[in-house]
Every structure is written in structure tokens, then in C-alpha cells.
Regions:
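Short sequence/structural segments immediately N-terminal
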Residues: 3-11, 19-377
Length: 377
């Protein structure tokens, strides 16, 4: 019995010593491990964890194309952006960077990097993103043009500004890609007022072309329906009165042979290109000028050249047949006014007289018939 107890005691002692040795070994192994992962960015990390690295000056990486991708983010610039002010986290856009070390960066060029990242905008701005899918920019991108504008090209990335910025900044955004058009626009009656004077009443690029569903001349209905774009401002009586401009321009255009044909196209064949001029064909597209500007396409000295774009055989007197956008009056085209007035009086008088003659003649015939019947009766 004593021998059995001694054997059990020795066995238990061996187990205790073995367990202690294993525990000590585990403790030693743990002490040799690197710092816990809680010290590096994890899913749900805040912006300060990202900026701890990405606010370091000169942070960059080389791409396979040989381009340098700068990774330093200016803290104040981001915090003053619309996203920074709303407290959005970096990882809401950079979803593939939620863990550290980061996943391999797949972009080969800086442009590829932008194309990979801009689609994250759709997570919060789905309706705006969907609108871009029908734009000329998106169609160009789908056609293989990687330089076509995407969200971040216009709005920026870490410096997104709120939409209440001065309207005069809009043309400068478009200028990044459309510099030649911008140079024409800034000298036009619209552009000089907006860019040079800060006048908020004149149209910027997006007022005519749209914001996210940007349209342009490559879209046939855009040209056909462009008079309606011009009419938004030029039929606004309050706005036009402010600048002493007539609101008759649309009505006089529609009453003209050119405008009548365009309206028929709009109603009957909206997908077909019209063979008649619209506003921009005569006044210019981005280079519209004041009517008394020597560079204006519709000033008297230049009008023949404008007409000859469609009427190559037009003579010097040809433009005189056009009433411009004036309604005939004693001041403008008095001869046409008097002819028009004459027919306004003459035609109702003739038709009215004929109508009275028919009525009197018919009445007389009925009365004569009644008299004959009474006489024979």
C-alpha cells in the first residue's frame, strides 16, 4: 500500500513539473512575438490612424509605369473638404486599405489608380453616378479613352469642395480638359461676364451641357433641341428685363422658316439631325458675342459670311430678308409692319364682307321662297 502511494505521488509531481515547463515555454515564446496588431490600422480604424503615416512629407511609391504616386495627404486640406467636415473615414473610399499591411496595389499607372478608386463614389452617390453612365464622358471611357473625365477629375479627391462654391470656378474645372473651348468661352458675352465680372446670371458650362449627365454635339438630339436650352434664360422676362433684352427671340425664331422646320423635326423625328440652323449655328457655340461686338457672327458686317455657311450662293442683299429677332414695327422694318397691318385689316374685311354677303343672300333667298309659298297657298 505504501509503495502504491509513493508511486502515485511521484507521478503527480512529474505531471506538475512537466506542465510548469510547458507554461514557461509558452510565456517565453509570447514574449518573443512582435507588438500586438492593435497598434496598426484594422477594419474600422479612424482617420488619425491613416494620417499617422500618410501625413509624413515626401511619402511616395513607384508604379510599374515609372510614374511616382505621391501618398502624402495634407491634413488641413482634407479636414476642410466637404468629406472631412462631415467626418467621413478614409476607409469609406479606400475600402481595400482596411488592413495593414495593405493589400498589393494593382494599378500600373496613376490614371489606372484613379480609375480604380473613383467607383467608390457610387457607394454614397449612387444616383449621381448612375446619371454619369449616359454622359459623353462615360461613353468615351467605355470606348477605351482612359482620359475621359471621372468624378475625381471634376470634384477632386481629398479636397472635395461643397457645391456652394462660386459659379465662376466651374469653367476652370472644365478648362483642365477643354482648354481651347475655355479660351473661346472666356471671351464670349457669357464667359466674360461670369469669369471676369463674377456675374451669376449668365450660363456656365453645366447650364448648357448638364452636370453629371453631360451631353454635347456627339449626341444628335443635343443640337436639335439646343434652342430649348437657350430659351431657359432668353424667355425669362424678369432676367431679360434686367439687361434690357427682348424675350421675343424664341417666338420670332419659331415663326421663321428655320425655326418652324426645327420644331417639326422635334415633334416628328426627334432622333434625326435637322438641316436647318438653330441658335448656335448663327450666334456661335462657345464664342457668342454681344450684338454690337465687331467679332459677332450676326453683326451686319459679318452676317453674310454666317448665312453663306448654309447658302453659299447668297448675295450681298440676302441677309436683308431676315428680320432678325424683331417683331415688325414702326421702328424695325416699317415696310413689313405696314404690309402686315394692311393684310390684318384687308383680309378680315374681305372675308367678313363675303361672309355678310353670303348671309344676306341666303336670308334673301329663304324669304323669297317663303313669300312664293304663301302667295301660292
Amino acid at each position: 500500500m505504501k509503495r502504491t502511494r509513493l508511486t502515485l505521488t511521484i507521478g503527480l509531481l512529474c505531471l506538475v513539473l512537466t506542465g510548469s515547463a510547458i507554461a514557461l515555454e509558452r510565456v517565453s515564446a509570447r514574449s518573443a512575438e512582435p507588438a500586438p496588431l492593435a497598434q496598426v490600422p484594422q477594419p474600422g480604424v479612424d482617420n488619425e490612424a491613416c494620417l499617422a503615416c500618410h501625413s509624413t512629407p515626401g511619402m511616395q511609391m513607384s508604379l510599374p509605369s515609372g510614374e511616382i504616386l505621391y501618398l502624402t495627404i495634407d491634413r488641413e486640406t482634407y479636414l476642410n473638404s466637404v468629406h472631412g467636415q462631415e467626418g467621413y473615414a478614409c476607409v469609406q473610399c479606400h475600402t481595400e486599405m482596411r488592413e495593414y499591411p495593405h493589400s498589393p496595389f494593382l494599378a500600373k499607372t496613376i490614371r489606372d489608380a484613379k480609375l480604380l478608386l473613383y467607383q467608390s463614389c457610387a457607394r454614397c452617390h449612387q444616383d449621381k453616378y448612375d446619371a454619369t453612365l449616359d454622359s459623353v464622358h462615360q461613353k468615351a471611357l467605355a470606348g477605351g479613352n482612359k482620359e475621359a473625365a471621372i468624378c475625381t477629375d471634376c470634384h477632386g479627391a481629398h479636397d472635395v469642395a461643397p457645391p456652394d462654391q462660386p459659379r465662376s470656378q466651374i469653367p476652370h474645372t472644365c478648362e483642365r480638359c477643354h482648354s481651347e473651348i475655355y479660351n473661346l468661352y472666356k471671351q464670349s458675352v457669357h464667359g466674360s461676364a461670369l469669369i471676369g465680372e463674377g456675374n451669376p446670371d449668365v450660363p456656365s458650362c453645366i447650364d448648357c451641357h448638364g452636370v453629371h449627365n453631360v451631353s454635347g454635339p456627339s449626341n444628335q438630339p443635343f443640337h436639335l433641341f439646343s434652342p430649348q436650352i437657350c430659351a431657359r434664360c432668353h424667355t425669362d422676362k424678369q432676367l431679360m428685363a434686367k439687361y434690357g433684352l427682348s424675350t421675343d427671340v424664341l417666338d420670332t425664331y419659331v415663326a421663321d422658316f428655320h425655326g418652324t422646320t426645327v420644331i417639326l423635326f422635334e415633334k416628328i423625328a426627334p432622333d434625326q439631325e435637322t438641316n436647318k440652323p438653330v441658335c448656335i449655328d448663327c450666334h456661335g457655340v462657345h464664342d457668342m458675342r454681344k450684338v454690337d461686338d465687331p467679332e459677332s457672327h450676326v453683326i451686319k458686317e459679318n452676317l453674310l459670311d454666317t448665312c453663306q455657311k448654309c447658302h453659299p450662293d447668297a448675295s450681298t442683299n440676302f441677309p436683308s430678308a431676315w428680320l432678325r429677332h424683331y417683331r415688325p414695327s414702326l421702328e424695325h422694318f416699317p415696310l413689313v409692319y405696314y404690309v402686315d397691318l394692311f393684310y390684318k385689316i384687308f383680309i378680315p374685311t374681305v372675308l367678313g364682307g363675303m361672309g355678310l354677303f353670303v348671309v344676306f343672300d341666303g336670308t334673301r333667298r329663304v324669304l323669297n321662297r317663303l313669300r312664293r309659298e304663301n302667295h301660292h297657298g
